A protein has these predicted regions:
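A short, local hydrophobic-aromatic micro-motif
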Residues: 109, 137-138, 217, 229, ...
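Phosphate-binding site of ATP-dependent enzymes
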Residues: 177-258, 278-280
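Generic secondary-structure signature for well-ordered alpha-helical cores
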Residues: 8-13, 134, 190-195, 224, ...
Length: 281
């Protein structure tokens, strides 16, 4: 909504559209929709402290179609000069939507389908990082059919972090501090996906570096008020303190910016991207 407001302030006609819920009107009534943008745009509520119940969201959709795109979404996107992508999660970030728009002739912001797919797959991205000499936490991938609940049988040390392979927003992520917690962490991650990543736990400060067209922006430090940077701390206002530029020695800051630029180049994120970093103690 902030982006939409900024665009409108600069003279653009903008419709804020929910890709799943869509816009329920007859297609023949879509002519002139950008002249009715304020009437059509969805109203954005405060983000809740917990991830939404996906079953409840699907049940609330009027047409109950199995299609990811809500009513009139495709047609409205085709009518726009460009679609600004502001989606989180699997279908919004993993390249599927980008590929669909490519086939439909819809212009959109952000990276293409292939780089989006690679960036969203943590296991694949880590392999590319390793080949390029970009450091990342040590870890393994695990598929549901090869599940192993006994952490002592795996090449891991505790504490570790269990997370869905292609998820986002820290949904399904657990920091496992002892063997008794491991099975529950697997249950949680496999609830969301059939493949997950298990990594060493890095205790330290968290940072984020944006990159626009290959050039890194200043480093931001992210310090949650409580706990780690989970769903609540990411989206609930006041749950984390963000400092920019981060209080770091220049050589450390420069190295983070360099790595962020390398990540964008290796994966092919040639428009804009963001890389997260942990600086251990």
């Amino acid at each position: 909504s902030m982006v939409a407001s900024a665009l409108k302030e600069n003279g653009h006609r903008v419709i804020l559209l929910d890709v799943f819920m869509g816009y329920s009107d007859k297609e023949e009534n879509l002519d002139g929709i950008f002249d009715r943008a304020d009437e059509i745009s969805v109203k954005v509520d405060d983000i809740p402290e917990v991830a939404p119940d996906l079953a409840a969201v699907k049940a609330s959709r009027k047409d109950q179609s199995p299609c990811f795109f809500g009513p009139n979404v495709i047609r409205m996107c085709q009518m726009a000069d460009i679609v600004l992508m502001a989606l989180h999660g699997e279908n919004g970030e993993n390249g599927k939507l980008q590929a669909a728009f490519d086939l439909l002739g819809v212009k959109y912001t952000g990276s293409d389908y292939l780089s989006s797919a690679i960036a969203m797959n943590k296991g694949m991205a880590k392999q590319l990082f390793a080949s390029a000499g970009i450091p990342a936490p040590r870890g393994i991938a695990m598929k549901k059919e090869n599940r192993e609940d006994d952490v002592t049988k795996l090449p891991l040390t505790l504490p570790c972090v269990v997370k869905p392979c292609c998820g986002g927003s820290s949904i399904g992520v657990t920091i496992v501090r002892d063997a008794a917690e491991f099975k529950k962490a697997l249950d949680e991650a496999f609830h969301w996906e059939d493949e997950l990543v298990i990594e060493e736990y890095v205790k330290g400060r968290e940072f984020s570096v944006g990159v626009i067209e290959g050039k890194a922006l200043p480093v931001i430090e992210i310090a949650p008020i409580q706990g780690f940077y989970d769903y609540k701390n990411k989206y609930k206002a006041g749950s984390a303190v963000e400092t920019c530029p981060a209080d770091l020695p220049e050589e450390v800051s420069a190295q983070m910016r360099k790595y962020a630029e390398q990540v964008a180049e290796v994966i092919g994120l040639d428009t804009y991207s963001r890389s997260d970093f942990l600086l251990d103690e």
